[in-house]
Amino acid sequence: MNEQEIFEKVQTIISEQLGVDKSQVTKDANFANDLGADSLDTVELVMAIEEAFNIEIPDDAAEQISNLQQAVDFISQKVAA
């Protein structure tokens, strides 16, 4: 799976989980500030991403992921390992 495929899959997950249009989920859109996610939304996002990619995101790493690009970068490293 290449980075573009990961980007599109995560973009869809974020859009569905937060109930926002995919066009709003840009690579730099902050989950909380730009997309209106609260702490529960963020936990649910992490769980959905873990399930979709069959990976585990440690709590300390999850706290550092606040936008789509950061999520894609983390997932790319995990699936490449």
Swiss-Prot record:
It comes from the Eukaryota. InterPro entries: ACP, ACP-like_sf, PP-bd_ACP, Ppantetheine_attach_site. GO terms for cellular component: chloroplast; cytosol; membrane. 4'-phosphopantetheine is transferred from CoA to a specific serine of apo-ACP by AcpS. This modification is essential for activity because fatty acids are bound in thioester linkage to the sulfhydryl of the prosthetic group. It holds the Pfam family PP-binding. Pathway: Lipid metabolism; fatty acid biosynthesis. The modification O-(pantetheine 4'-phosphoryl)serine is found at S39. Coiled coil: none annotated. Carrier of the growing fatty acid chain in fatty acid biosynthesis. HAMAP family: Acyl_carrier. This is Acyl carrier protein. The lineage of its organism: Eukaryota, Cryptophyceae, Pyrenomonadales, Geminigeraceae, Guillardia. The gene is acpP.
